[in-house]
């Protein structure tokens, strides 16, 4: 018969052992911390309200503890949650079918997409590109429904070495001017590939910033700031779009800059529209119509993406405490970000970069004479793509909505075609 120590003796020995005392102390501290964490989690992480969200402090996940909800785990992508107040854009089509269908042809709606056989504008027959500065060869390959970038070098005998193949997960850019290509890691990170399709020249080339011997290769990280203007807001966990959070994205991303980037969240509007007891005025008031906003707020809807002081420096600075996806149409853009300009010695009228259209608008006589009534929407219909063949007549008609024919001081003449400077380097 096996003999053992009495229970009382065992307990006395445990309390007498310093190592046991230390173990018990750690357990007690852990229990207290867990209770404190559970009791204060809502207080520390609840998003603040109002136009100026305060800094949110959130304890980091403890070693061995529960992970932050929605955070990427090894081998997993972030678990998406529905963005509050937003709905899939196709729900807008139930009442606005004509506008919805027309908008699908506009560049903004096609700014981000999956590679698809029905959406090919590239030349995959003439798919080879050699980049002299880095001495690397590239081939863009289509394998059924899959797009692949192949990169390699040649040895002294002309044989391929250092071969890398990377499948393409996403296309960024509408293709009006160019298209770039991204791949997504299991952790949810997005990286840009070096090769771009340039539509105007119908050719492959290096992406902007890659035309040098020591470029980023396949390691250029796509940040939330990049995605802000290239896509609709993704479905991410609250707080995951703030400063210091990793730039990770769910697998199921929106495809294109949708209706709600300009009109605001549409869930409440749709819910009220489906209730026959709700007055029409209340339904209309539940969605933002930029054309009915005060002039500065109206312009801010466009300026959130179409105003950048310079691409050479960090000129768009989001206010600390604001998430990347926290701007809503109808809010002052200055509450969300700050535009930092620089003085290079030239008059502003002589400067023009990719997103300087608002500067030119504010310099125009029409804008000044109308006290700001002239806006982007005066000439541009964001729901419609104007084809090159109809552009001259279309924009002439827009001018004539304000100007009579006898107001013209110059003889009508054709427009001289110009090409934009090559900014790929």
Q: Residue locations for each model-derived region?
A:
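Local sequence-structure signature of Cys/Sec-based thiol-disulfide redox active-site neighborhoods
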Residues: 80-97
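Hydrophobic membrane-insertion alpha-helices, especially the h-region
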Residues: 20-35
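Hydrophobic single-pass membrane-insertion segments
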Residues: 33-44
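Charged, low-complexity intrinsically disordered segments
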Residues: 12-14, 77-78, 82-84
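Primarily the internal scaffold of c-type cytochrome electron-transfer domains
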Residues: 48-76, 83, 98-173, 180-185, ...
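A short, surface-exposed interaction/processing loop segment used at functional sites
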Residues: 191-223
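N-terminal Sec-pathway targeting helices
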Residues: 7-24
């Amino acid at each position: 018969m096996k003999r053992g120590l009495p229970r009382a003796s065992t307990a006395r020995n445990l309390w007498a052992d310093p190592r046991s005392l230390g173990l018990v102390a750690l357990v007690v501290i852990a229990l207290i911390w867990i209770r404190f964490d559970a009791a204060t989690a809502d207080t520390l992480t609840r998003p603040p309200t109002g136009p100026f969200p305060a800094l949110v402090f959130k304890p980091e996940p403890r070693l061995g503890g529960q992970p932050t909800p929605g955070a990427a785990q090894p081998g997993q992508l972030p678990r998406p949650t529905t963005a509050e107040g937003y709905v899939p854009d196709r729900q807008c089509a139930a009442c606005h079918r004509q506008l919805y269908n027309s908008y699908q042809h506009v560049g903004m709606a096609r700014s981000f997409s999956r590679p698809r056989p029905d959406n090919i504008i590239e030349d995959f027959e003439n798919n080879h590109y050699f980049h002299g500065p880095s001495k690397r060869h590239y081939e863009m390959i289509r394998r059924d429904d899959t797009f692949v970038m192949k990169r390699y070098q040649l040895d002294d005998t002309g044989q391929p070495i250092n071969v890398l193949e990377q499948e393409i997960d996403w296309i960024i850019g509408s293709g009006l001017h160019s298209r770039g290509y991204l791949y997504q890691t299991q952790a949810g990170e997005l990286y840009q590939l070096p090769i771009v399709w340039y539509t105007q020249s119908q050719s492959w080339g290096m992406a902007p910033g890659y035309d040098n011997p020591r470029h980023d290769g396949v390691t250029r990280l796509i940040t939330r700031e990049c995605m802000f203007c290239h896509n609709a807001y993704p479905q991410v966990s609250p707080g995951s779009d703030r400063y210091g959070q990793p730039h990770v994205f769910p697998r199921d991303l929106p495809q294109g800059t949708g209706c709600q980037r300009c009109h605001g969240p549409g869930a409440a509007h749709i819910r009220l529209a489906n209730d026959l007891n709700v007055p029409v005025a209340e339904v209309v008031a539940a969605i933002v119509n930029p054309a009915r906003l005060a002039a500065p707020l109206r312009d801010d809807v466009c300026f959130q993406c179409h105003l950048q002081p310079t691409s050479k420096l960090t000129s768009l600075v989001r206010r600390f405490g604001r998430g990347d996806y926290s701007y809503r149409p109808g809010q002052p853009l200055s509450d969300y970000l700050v535009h930092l300009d620089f003085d290079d010695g030239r008059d502003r009228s002589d400067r023009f970069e990719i997103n300087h259209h608002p500067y030119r608008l504010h310099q125009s006589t029409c804008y000044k004479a109308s006290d700001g009534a002239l806006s982007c929407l005066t000439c541009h219909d964001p729901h419609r793509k104007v084809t090159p063949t109809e552009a001259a007549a279309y924009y002439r008609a827009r001018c004539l909505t304000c100007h009579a024919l006898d107001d013209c001081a110059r003889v009508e003449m054709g427009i001289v075609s110009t090409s934009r400077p090559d900014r790929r380097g």
